[in-house]
Amino acid sequence: MSASKLWSCTETVLNGGIKLFLYSSKNTKLRVAIGEVPGPMVHGAVSFVTEADSDDGLPHTLEHLVFMGSKKYPFKGVLDVIANRCLADGTNAWTDTDHTAYTLSTVGSDGFLKVLPVYINHLLTPMLTASQFATEVHHITGEGNDAGVVYSEMQDHESEMESIMDRKTKEVIYPPFNPYAVDTGGRLKNLRESCTLEKVRDYHKKFYHLSNMVVTVCGMVDHDQVLEIMNNVENEHMSTVPDHFPKPFSFALSDIKESTVHRVECPTDDASRGAVEVAWFAHSPSDLETHSSLHVLFDYLSNTSVAPLQKDFILLEDPLASSVSFHIAEGVRCDLRLNFAGVPVEKLDECAPKFFDKTVREHLEEANFDMERMGYLIDQTILNELVKLETNAPKDIMSHIIGHQLFDNEDEELFKKRTNEIDFLKKLKSEPASYWVQLVNKYFTAPSATVIGVPNEELVDKIAEEEEKRIAAQCEKLGKKGLEEAGKSLEAAILENTANHPSAELLDQLIVKDLEAFDRFPVQSLTSNSPSLTPQQSTFLAQFPFHANLHNCPTKFVEIFFLLDSSNLSIEDRSYLFLYTDLLFESPAMIDGVLTSADDVAKHFTKDLIDHSIQVGVSGLYDRFVNLRIKVGADKYPLLAKWAQIFTQGVVFDPSRIHQCAQKLAGEARDRKRDGCTVASTAVASMVYGKNTNCILFDELVLEKLHEKISKDVMKNPEAVLEKLEQVRSALFSNGVNAHFVADVDSIDPKMLSSDLWTWVQADPRFGPGHQFSAEAGENVSLELGKELLIGVGGSESSFIYQTSFLDANWNSEELIPAMIFGQYLSQCEGPLWRAIRGDGLAYGANVFVKPDRKQITLSLYRCAQPAVAYERTRDIIRKIVESGEISKAEFEGAKRSTVFEMMKREGTVSGAAKISILNNFRQTPHPFNIDLCRRIWNLTSEEMVKIGGPPLARLFDEKCFVRSIAVHPSKLNEMKKAFPGSSKIKISDLQFAC
């Protein structure tokens, strides 16, 4: 009997592009969704509806504990070991307010189908032992500190302004202990005191069973094979399905009775900026039309410089915020949030009243809606839904399936409607202004809750003092004997967790043994000199008066990456580059010889373009280049040339816009200063790269003081600032231009192809000759070897360490693959660092990254609970492995296969494959290089890995060969100075550009 005979099936096509099948078991309520997404990757998710009623973090702690082993596979981390051996890079999961989802991605379907039944076995029958709870959730160390993987993770959120405000909003709008009000991640106090193993076991029994489970698979897989696996799962676990399972979230929520305002104080190093959040209850989650309409309305109100909220709050001489954004959280009643970030502390009380009194009031009148712009926005939204089919279809499918699982009560029509949003968006375009007025009136005039996040520098020290007192009291209560017992208990837990190991026979069954021919996207990298061009390709490439590459691939869109070389910028001019790029989409411009206002420019590009952006670097690498990216439908190809000209030549710098943008960027920098990871990253970059490089100077945090100064200078002496920006433009033009086009050239009407579209480049004397750009790996690196920086960040309770050394290798070097595999061997899920650092609760993440394009090896210790101990143990483990050469064969095979996964994941979508093709031009590697690289990885021996890859790893811990940055809470500065005596204490201001 075919496996599918035991299932009923509902079929639809995701937004007209990808076939989607939803199978429902005839025996239980188990459902399996399969989306036929093309490409080499197979992505999966197993989701459960999960409801909590306390801050104990039961959904989150359970999410962590299921990975510790199952009753059938009672080996810590075996799931990730098997996943690595089956061409994955471990597994992952997330916990949300109303569901928990577990993910798996592999190259090809063979490995996916091997791992899936083992994965589900872990989910349905986890071990859930006391020793696992101790190391993974919370324990007290022999020194009296609190630790654990979950505890380390949640430390980073406890004192964040965003988290504090969110908790307050939930407290105000939901009843006490309501599932939407509690912190599903777990509060630190609860993790220490009230979260217990018994509660976790009861929680698992209640929610983790077949009738509450949906499996989603995206990729080219055999449906019968997937369903056969699920038949076996169902037969094995049928007895665990409860006779009666009350549907979670089966309650009603009352309206917010009256509008209220609440203030919460938040610890921060910079008390000049706070935040404001406004919340409302809105529609039912099954009202998909209103959901789509609100997203469009939010775009209308907030996106681009012509948007009302931009004008009312950001683009002002004296801004009220640096950014404004909307968010909808689906639930029994959808929860709308409006967030103002970077609000000057003296204006915190002005944001919400102005929103209601001006923005909302004005949009209760039909005449104030620009319906032409609204139509452009809806068209753009439709096109972006189609783009997602090429760029991120698995994520889109999983989101729809989980939404259906949570809210649609197994209604097939709602399922089809949810997965075909474009049908409704097309109808939405015909709605009159009165429709949008009704939406504004219905939701934004309803009672709301406003929460104001007030920054408080004194709280940083107060919280630190309270934590010190708490730990001191904890140590006193335990006493010397109790601390010794705590240390011994931890050691015993670690020993128990790691006592059992899978047999060689089991591991041999669960491995992909052959490197298969994956279903890759065909991409041709072509220039006008390429042999065997088709007539259409030849005509296309003959248009350009500069060097151009065509990356011909199966896409419905045309995308240009318009590159400018910034090597001629002085350090003073380069410090203006961030502002320059920000202004390109926010300024007036010459269009068809007419000076057009910034508002009308924004309106025009919303009409003409699907997407556009500007950044430094090519896919985040080769930062010397400034990269203007524009995307249109194939039927609008000529618009690429039009808008490339407008954004480069046509922009007219306006003093008022410069003032507004500079203030906005300074405000965004203040938000970034609260994040320890960001600060540590900026600090290490300051020691790795040359001072006059984009790697240093294209950073809002570094440029905060300069942007503040420019915002003032441009009002006093606009000519000087305008001259500086024009110098930046001329310097960028001086090296000419290169372009990379991503398109299916045969989908472009030949009549549209004309060299006349690009004559403006030749006509502008500022453009240098458009010779082919080249770059060297690591060309911006200028390591200050031996330097160490230690910096306090009051907005975060976690610690972060980055350590970087030089790697003398590029993509063609013999040393590269052994070093890459060695880094992956150490860092892989359930590898040496994972077990010793994350597994013992010292830090949330410990990874070694080998970066050939930057010629660097970097150690990252992320969200450390015990940073000094985590670092010392990491160093000792790596040194021991390098010196002894002792390698686990099973883990080595897993490292090779998970590295193949990383290589192939980058070309897992057609857009990703095209970006790899572009990068190959700078790496000076042929287009099929990825396949050759995978073969070389596959054939590497462990002896070669240690012999060739070991020395670069050893240099990472030679004090003469590395730089190090450490970001910690200010209360830990003295402790870290003792642990790292060679480090220099600095302030965030020391990282900033001197102006």
UniProtKB/Swiss-Prot annotation:
SUPFAM superfamilies: LuxS/MPP-like metallohydrolase. Disulfide bonds: none annotated. InterPro entries: Metalloenz_LuxS/M16, Pept_M16_N, Peptidase_M16_C. This is Uncharacterized protein C05D11.1. GO terms for molecular function: metal ion binding. Signal peptide: none annotated. It comes from the Eukaryota.
